[in-house]
Amino acid sequence: MARVKRAVNAHKKRRVILERAEGYRGQRSRLYRKAKEQVTHSLVYAYRDRRQKKGDFRRLWIQRINAASRANGLTYNRFIQGLGLAGVEVDRRILAELAVNEPATFTALVETAKKALPADTSAPKADAAA
């Protein structure tokens, strides 16, 4: 049986790791062991953050919708409740896009939500103060 020399495979393996570590600071881009650790961590971070990004964007959309709906006299949760009662099925990404780029359209949606909402029974009555 022929003898198997592994130098080619070993060099390729190391080269791939060091290529992936290009741009890292200090030893992490030059020394194989440090580069391997950092590349492994980088892949873990990338995997985790691909999932985390979805929640981050949802939170951003909710903040934008809340700010725009408050500017139109309605809180975020009442706005979403009103849209549901009105039968408007627009997701938060589109609502945030409308809030930023189409304020007139967003205002129309807020008015639609206001009309669909029931009267607020927990609010103090105007004649009770008099």
From Swiss-Prot:
Superkingdom field: Bacteria
Family matches, as PANTHER family: 39S RIBOSOMAL PROTEIN L20 (PTHR10986)
Family the entry assigns: Belongs to the bacterial ribosomal protein bL20 family.
SUPFAM superfamilies, per the entry: Ribosomal protein L20 (SSF74731)
Gene3D superfamilies given in the database record: 6.10.160.10, Ribosomal protein L20
Keywords: Ribonucleoprotein, Ribosomal protein, RNA-binding, rRNA-binding
InterPro entries from the UniProt entry: Ribosomal_bL20 (IPR005813), RIBOSOMAL_L20_CS (IPR049946), Ribosomal_protein_bL20_C (IPR035566)
Pfam families (alphabetical): Ribosomal_L20 (PF00453)
Function per UniProt: Binds directly to 23S ribosomal RNA and is necessary for the in vitro assembly process of the 50S ribosomal subunit. It is not involved in the protein synthesizing functions of that subunit.
GO annotations of cellular component type: ribonucleoprotein complex; ribosome
UniProt name for this protein: Large ribosomal subunit protein bL20
Gene Ontology terms: biological process: ribosomal large subunit assembly; translation
Molecular function GO labels: rRNA binding; structural constituent of ribosome
NCBIfam families with a match to the protein in the record: rplT_bact (TIGR01032)
